[in-house]
Amino acid sequence: MTQPAFFKRPLPSTLAEIAASTGAQLVDASRGGIRIIGLASLDQAGPMHLAFFDNHKYAGQLAATKAGACLVSPRFEADVPAHVAVLRSKAPFRAFVSIARDFHGDALRPQSWFDNTAVAASAVIHPSAYLEDEVVIDPLAVIGPDVQIGRGSVIGSGAVIGPGVRIGRDCNVGAGTTIQATLIGNNVLIHPGCHIGQDGYGFIFFGSEGHVKVPQTGRVLIQNDVEIGAGTTIDRGSLRDTVIGEGTKIDNQVQIGHNVTIGRRCLLAAQIGLAGSLTIGDNVALGAKVGINNHLHIGDGAQVTAMSGVKDDIPANGRWGGYFAKPTRQWFRELLAVERLVRDGAPDAGSPKAAPKDRVIE
């Protein structure tokens, strides 16, 4: 349920308007004048809220809901209580998201925490920095020499933008973020606490001198429409650039090593670790806590299951998982084989199939 203390309350809409906006069918047209003032889950919704249902696991919540209306697929339509107006949709969650975006556009992109519309008095702006019109700088942010920031961008409180950084238009840099040696496109959303463009992890062993640092003289290039979750770190390249492709969405606490290239429209879930000089194609999806070794290539459209460890190249459209990762069908077959061994015991030598026997494990 939307909390008005943090998000603006939307203007009321009628069910007829919602049906027209989403393409859903209002089953009982006589209910078209019912007003909806907000969105909520089935278990929290009230008579003036819209909910959705597309998973049988929540059938109990649907039966008990007090929602005024519910977006539902045709196969679940008969399960909706009589007091709830039915909006029939082939994709109820997609329709719900569409309405949520209309109702709560302010939640899609963080704005100034202080309702600033310009540069705060306590922000530090180097004289050589260039800010286009309508740039907002929150208190205590620091903008370094020769920085350029495009129109409509918002820099959060305590953020530090290093020398020469370029930030495009309609971007948002969250509070406490640091950015150096980086070029950023338009419509990029960087959540609080990110660190972008710092040294990559590069050392070489020089005998008695120990591990000697390798200069990291590349950049980070972040293309248009990228979103980067809170606490994520992206190292700049050593000789070539670290690149984040257009439309890629990165979750919280992801580590991206130097020289990594990530393609367009990729999805990276939380706590992924990408070693250096890795190349990831377009439309790749990586589950949470995936680790990928350096100098590998992940093909277009590949998917990797959460908590997998990848040490080999993955072909385009590959579905891999496990530790170490392999094609998912092979991984599942091996898991089943291990389960059978644990359950039945290994066959005796020379016997095609030994009878199960009791074992004592100490």
From Swiss-Prot:
Pfam families: Hexapep, Hexapep_2, LpxD. InterPro entries: Hexapep, Hexapep_transf_CS, LpxD, Trimer_LpxA-like_sf, UDP_GlcNAc_AcTrfase_non-rep. Keywords: Acyltransferase, Lipid A biosynthesis, Lipid biosynthesis, Lipid metabolism, Repeat, Transferase. The keyword Coiled coil does not apply. The active site is at H258. It catalyses: a UDP-3-O-[(3R)-3-hydroxyacyl]-alpha-D-glucosamine + a (3R)-hydroxyacyl-[ACP] = a UDP-2-N,3-O-bis[(3R)-3-hydroxyacyl]-alpha-D-glucosamine + holo-[ACP] + H(+). It is an enzyme of class 2 (transferase). It comes from the Bacteria. Its EC number is 2.3.1.191. Pathway: Bacterial outer membrane biogenesis; LPS lipid A biosynthesis. GO terms for cellular component: membrane. The keyword Lipid metabolism applies. GO terms for molecular function: N-acyltransferase activity. GO terms for biological process: lipid A biosynthetic process. Belongs to the transferase hexapeptide repeat family. LpxD subfamily. HAMAP family: LpxD. Catalyzes the N-acylation of UDP-3-O-acylglucosamine using 3-hydroxyacyl-ACP as the acyl donor. Is involved in the biosynthesis of lipid A, a phosphorylated glycolipid that anchors the lipopolysaccharide to the outer membrane of the cell. Homotrimer. This is UDP-3-O-acylglucosamine N-acyltransferase 1. It comes from Nitrobacter winogradskyi (strain ATCC 25391 / DSM 10237 / CIP 104748 / NCIMB 11846 / Nb-255).
